[in-house]
Amino acid sequence: MLLPLLVATVGHAAWDNVLHWMIVNDPDTSIFHMHWLRMVIVYLFMWIIPSKKTKSTRSLWWWFTFSLYGWTLPAISYTVCVMLTGYRIAVSFQPFIPLLVVLQTGAVLEGYRLVGLNFAMLGTLSVWVWSPWYHKDLELWQIWAALFAATVQVLSLTKWFVILPRENTLYYMKHGVGGAILTLFFVMIIWAPENMSADFLAKPDKWLLVLTFAGIGTACKNWVISSATSRMTIDAVAIFECLHPVATLCSDIILQKDVFEYEDIVTVTLLAIGWILYPKRNI
């Protein structure tokens, strides 16, 4: 399970970097179109992974909300947050996902669960104490908009983990991705910006490689989540959704696309300690 998780984390980081680069350098970029293309690749790779067929009695409304909370809203809101202020606000909000899942499911906050969440929340606090976006030319509305987008991501993923079926999870996730593809298809109204289309046609091999790698990474993450639901508490599984923003921030710093702050070491260390200490087994 560690290898697919590593592939998923690196794949997500690569996708985040490329998508952010497109948004910064091409104002005509459609984030809906880019996410739709990636989800198509994810859908194809997920159907390669075998899963048991099951007779679902879920309503169409349940399927719509399942795909909306699991893929459509988190992807778009996370991208908007990063586009406005960078990755640090998004990173600071990640510990709220397992915390809210705990509160929603009625799990007891004690022992290592409480200690782990405290360390993760200290990581969040360290981001806001140092305000590491001060060197960016940001306006106040951008920070507030990023806060709203990050809140949407956290609340939607919390709802998704709460309603996530614990049996035959991969089957439901496959159909959830399919629902997200249909939703984004209607939202973007089959719109491909001319600049992005020209760039894609000029370097089709590069774009195909990026989309494929991103699709494999996300498919691996979905497989890890579906496999872990039967062996881990659902709040512990939610931690898997918290990894790729941290990986992307670290990769941006390494590639010198973002300004390195010594406080980043404190933040990442506290988050890592919290998630390592967090109890994983479903006892």
Task: Cite the ranges covered by each PLM segment.
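Specific transmembrane alpha-helical segments of multi-pass solute transporters/efflux pumps
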Residues: 11, 15-16, 51-90, 94, ...
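C-terminal-most transmembrane helix of multi-pass membrane proteins
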Residues: 35, 39, 242-283
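Hydrophobic transmembrane alpha-helices of multi-pass small-molecule transport proteins
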Residues: 46, 112-132, 262-282
